[in-house]
Amino acid sequence: MHGLKREFRIASRNRISKEIGALMGQGKKEEAEAKKAEVAAGAKRLAELEASETELQEKITKIMMVIPNIIDESVPIGKDDSQNVEIEKFGEPIVPDFEVPYHADILDRLNGLDKESAGRTSGNGFYYLMGDAARIHSAMISYARDFMIDKGFTYCIPPFMIRSSVVNGVMSFAEMEAMMYKIEGEDLYLIGTSEHSMIGKFKGQIVEEKSLPITMTSYSPCFRKEVGSHGIEERGVYRVHQFEKQEMVVLCKPEDSMDWYNKMWSYTVEFFRSLDVPV
C-alpha cells in the first residue's frame, strides 16, 4: 500500500509540475504559486512515505531472515543439542592407560604453537602454527582437497570477502552480528566459511537443469568473531578467530537434495575412517 501511495504521489507531482509551467506561460502567477505550494506539500508527504516504506521493508526482511530452511521429515526435532539423536558411529576410541595430554600441551612440546606472540600481534583468539605442526596442518588440507577431487568435486579457491547482499542470503542478522567481521568503509565482510562465497557464486544466476548437479570443494581461511555462549577458547585452537578448512558445496534439484546430503555425509565418514579416526 505504501508503495502504491508513493507511486501515486510521484505521478501527481509530475503532473502538477507541468501545470505550473503552463500557468506561468499564461501569466497566471498566483495560480502557479498555489500549485507550487501543493507540490511542496506533496514532496514532504512523499519523503514521509519513502521513510515509512524503508522502515517497513527492513522489518519484513528481518522477519524473512529468521524463517528457517525446510528440513527433511526424517530429521528429529529437538530444543537444543542435548536432544540430538545418535544414528550411527564408526570405530572405537582408543582409551590409553595414561592421562591424555591436552592438544595445546602436545603442540607446546613440539614447539608448534605460539599464542603469546599472536596475542601481541593480533589479540586473543589467534595463534602462530610453527614447524612440523604447520606442515601437518598444510598436509591435511591438501589431503582433504585431493580426497574430494577424487570424488568428482571441482576444486575452487573462492573470494575471502563477500558483499552484504551475499551475507544476507546465507545467514540471519543475528548470526551475521555474532560471526562476521565487516571491512570498515566497504560493503564487504570476511567470510566465516567458504560456503558463503561458494553459494554467492550463483547469486542472481539461472542454472540450467541439465548442468545439475554442480559439485564443488573449496578451501579458505575462515574468520569469526565467536560472540555468544561458547566464546574464545583460552588455551587451545578449536574455537578461535581465524582457521582454515575444506568444504563441500552441491547445487542440485530439490528432490535430489536428501540423496546428496547422504552422499556428503558418507564422504565425511569415509574421510575420517581413512585416517583411523572414530566418528
Predicted segments with their positions:
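N-terminal alpha-helical targeting/anchoring segments
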Residues: 1-93, 108, 112
